[in-house]
């Protein structure tokens, strides 16, 4: 009985850690959109996390 409870708690903790890690990876990928946006003729569209030419409008925000 005690072993079963320990195993259930361990599985719950590991599942929570995986969810947190996946969420963090998603946030890093989202923020990466403007990371390489540098130069004299480009700009960062923060809402869409995109780097575009200064001659173009920002794309709509990603969901």
Swiss-Prot record:
Keywords: Disulfide bond, Knottin, Neurotoxin, Secreted, Signal, Toxin. It is found in: Secreted. Expressed by the venom duct. Residues 1-22 form the signal peptide. One of its GO terms (cellular component) is extracellular region. The keyword Disulfide bond applies. Disulfide bonds join 34-45, 37-51, 44-58. It comes from the Eukaryota. One of its GO terms (molecular function) is toxin activity. The keyword Signal applies. Probable neurotoxin. The cysteine framework is VI/VII (C-C-CC-C-C). Belongs to the conotoxin O1 superfamily. This is Conotoxin Cal6.28.
């Amino acid at each position: 009985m005690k072993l079963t409870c320990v195993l259930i708690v361990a599985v719950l903790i590991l599942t929570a850690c995986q969810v947190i890690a996946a969420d963090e990876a998603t946030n890093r990928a989202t923020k990466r959109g403007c990371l390489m946006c540098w130069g004299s003729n480009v700009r960062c569209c923060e809402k869409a996390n995109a780097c575009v030419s200064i001659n173009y409008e920002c794309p709509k925000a990603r969901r």
